[in-house]
Every structure is written in structure tokens, then in C-alpha cells.
């Protein structure tokens, strides 16, 4: 008997099954199609077989870590939400997917990762509370820098020199995109009628994050909440496909009774790697900043350092 497919994704919060855009899209598509996945909702990407989230381990042991490729694999396994779409609807799907990535994705990244208030009070707060030590000290900041670089690439050569002008232009285009989605949806349950398709999985992931998070700076969120059919659309999908998971609170850092469970593969190995990486990062920072300098001294200090590392590892068990 073949092993079950396993999906590793970011855990949930803000009333959603996942706080990550890509993880939420893949989870939603899987629910739409009824794909039999063993889902691991985690807050440490190093516990993923690819080191990134989301990631799918297929029944043959192959690891896929790009959302579109994960969905393509599910289609090959005959879990295809677009099976009944016409050629015209397939073309519309591609057009709207391109629109989402070009007009809505940059502003979503800006809203959660670049806007100072939102990042400090919402995004960094959730990841810092959910991630294990010591990842919660440095990984949110690294993720923010990566999103800033991606946003610069998305803006491309048409980027205005004035940052305020760029932000105004991005948000204007995103509002127009939301309005267009609202007009296209109309009074339908889903974008192509009574059954969900892959487009619905991606649109929902964009809209639900924007709708559910309590953002102190929510210009685009306010525009979305004025489009009542899109808000009802998100609520319908949440209640129908995530009736229990959507109500979960952000996961606290817990110490499970049995650290070697099936839900946490390679836990011991990754705990040790996490602690060592954190200690190395803090030691490197101390050396580079001049807080600590290397001098010739007796080696009596080494046992104390080793004891500290063991104590931190014990706390992670």
C-alpha cells in the first residue's frame, strides 16, 4: 500500500487554517477536491522536508515545494477542481491568476510585511509567538527582508523613485483589482457557478488573509469590507470547508508529552539544528558587533558554555 501524501504548511491564526498565503491556497484546493492529505501544520519551516512551506511529500517520496506544482501534482492524482471547466473558463482562470499576481500580490506583501504598524503589531507578533526559540528571534526579520526583495522585483523597472507615489499607485491598482473581482463574482457562490475551482482557492487565500487579520493600518482592508459579496464569499468558504479549523487560535509554543509523534517527523534532529543555528547566529552577531572579543584566556569558560547549550536544548524537548 502506497504511503499517504503529506502536506507541510504554516499553522493557522486570525480565524484561518493557515496565516500563509501559499499554504492557505494549497490547503483550500485540497479541501475543494477532497485530496487525502496528511496535513502537518507547523511553525518551523526547518521541519519541512524541503526547508520551506508549503511542501508536499508524495506517496512515492518526492518532495514538491512550489504551490502551483503541488496543485499540478494533485491534478495528476485525479484531484482536479477544474475538470468541468470550459476552454473559455480555463482562459479566464489564467487571466485572473495573472491579475492577482500582478495587482494584488504586491500590496498584500506590502500590507503584512512592509507597512511598519502592521508588521510590528500583527505579522511579527504572530510569528514571534508561534515560532520556537531561537527561530522567533531572527527568522521573522529575515522573512521580511525576503519579502522586501520580492516586492522590488514585482514592481520592476516601472517603479517610481518616490516611495509614497509607489505606495499610492500600488494600492490604487489593488483596489481596482478587488472591484473587478467583485463584479466578476456577482451573486454566484463561486467564480464559475456552484462548484469551486482552482481560481477560487487562490482568490480566497488572498481575500481571507486581508479580511481576517486585525490590521491597524488597513486601507485595502477597508475597501474589501465595502465589497459585501466578496466578504460573504470568504465567509461561505470558511464555514463550508474549514468549519472547525478556521476557529482555531494562533498556536502557542507547546511542549508535547511525546516528542517523537508521527505529527512531528525528525523533531529531535531539527530541534538540535535549530538550537545550534540560533547559538551560532547569536555568537556571530556578538563577535561582529564587538560585544565579545576573542582573547587568550584559560579554557575554564568552555564547560559553562556547554551547559548553557544543553539547558536550551532541554527546554525545547
From Swiss-Prot:
One of its GO terms (cellular component) is SAM complex. The chain crosses the membrane at residues 164-184. It is found in: Mitochondrion outer membrane. Pfam families: GST_C_6, Tom37. Gene3D superfamilies: 1.20.1050.10. There is a cross-link at residues 38, 41, 78 (Glycyl lysine isopeptide (Lys-Gly) (interchain with G-Cter in ubiquitin)). Ubiquitinated by PRKN during mitophagy, leading to its degradation and enhancement of mitophagy. Deubiquitinated by USP30. It comes from the Eukaryota. One of its GO terms (biological process) is mitochondrion organization. Keywords: Isopeptide bond, Membrane, Mitochondrion, Mitochondrion outer membrane, Protein transport, Transmembrane, Transmembrane helix, Transport, Ubl conjugation. Belongs to the metaxin family. Interacts with MTX2/metaxin-2. Associates with the mitochondrial contact site and cristae organizing system (MICOS) complex, composed of at least MICOS10/MIC10, CHCHD3/MIC19, CHCHD6/MIC25, APOOL/MIC27, IMMT/MIC60, APOO/MIC23/MIC26 and QIL1/MIC13. This complex was also known under the names MINOS or MitOS complex. The MICOS complex associates with mitochondrial outer membrane proteins SAMM50, MTX1 and MTX2 (together described as components of the mitochondrial outer membrane sorting assembly machinery (SAM) complex) and DNAJC11, mitochondrial inner membrane protein TMEM11 and with HSPA9. Involved in transport of proteins into the mitochondrion. Essential for embryonic development. This is Metaxin-1.
Amino acid at each position: 500500500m502506497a504511503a499517504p501524501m503529506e502536506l507541510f504548511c504554516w499553522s493557522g491564526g486570525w480565524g484561518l487554517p493557515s496565516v500563509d498565503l501559499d499554504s492557505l491556497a494549497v490547503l483550500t484546493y485540497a479541501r475543494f477536491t477532497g485530496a487525502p492529505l496528511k496535513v502537518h501544520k507547523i511553525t518551523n519551516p526547518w521541519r519541512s522536508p524541503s526547508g520551506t512551506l508549503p511542501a508536499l511529500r508524495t506517496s512515492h517520496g518526492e518532495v514538491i515545494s512550489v504551490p502551483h506544482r503541488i496543485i499540478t501534482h494533485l491534478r495528476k492524482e485525479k484531484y482536479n477542481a477544474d475538470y468541468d471547466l470550459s476552454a473559455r473558463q480555463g482562459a479566464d482562470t489564467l487571466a485572473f491568476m495573472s491579475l492577482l499576481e500582478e495587482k494584488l500580490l504586491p500590496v498584500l506583501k506590502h500590507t503584512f510585511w512592509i507597512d511598519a504598524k502592521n508588521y510590528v503589531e500583527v505579522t511579527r507578533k504572530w510569528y514571534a509567538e508561534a515560532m520556537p526559540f531561537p527561530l522567533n528571534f531572527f527568522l521573522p526579520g529575515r522573512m521580511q527582508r525576503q519579502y522586501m526583495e520580492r516586492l522590488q522585483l514585482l514592481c520592476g523597472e516601472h517603479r517610481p523613485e518616490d516611495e509614497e507615489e509607489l505606495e499610492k499607485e500600488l494600492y490604487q491598482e489593488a483596489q481596482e483589482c478587488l472591484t473587478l473581482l467583485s463584479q466578476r463574482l456577482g451573486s454566484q457562490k463561486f467564480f464559475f457557478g456552484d462548484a469551486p475551482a482552482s481560481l477560487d482557492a487562490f482568490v480566497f487565500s488572498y481575500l481571507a488573509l486581508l479580511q481576517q487579520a486585525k490590521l491597524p493600518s488597513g486601507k485595502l482592508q477597508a475597501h474589501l469590507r465595502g465589497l459585501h459579496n466578496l466578504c460573504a464569499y470568504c465567509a461561505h468558504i470558511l464555514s463550508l470547508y474549514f468549519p472547525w479549523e478556521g476557529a482555531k487560535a494562533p498556536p502557542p509554543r507547546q511542549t508535547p508529552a511525546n516528542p517523537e509523534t508521527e505529527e512531528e517527523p525528525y523533531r529531535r534532529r531539527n530541534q538540535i539544528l535549530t538550537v545550534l543555528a540560533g547559538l551560532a547566529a547569536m555568537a556571530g552577531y556578538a563577535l561582529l558587533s564587538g560585544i565579545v572579543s576573542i582573547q587568550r584566556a584559560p579554557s575554564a569558560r568552555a564547560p559553562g558554555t556547554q551547559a548553557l547549550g544543553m539547558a536550551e536544548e532541554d527546554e525545547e524537548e
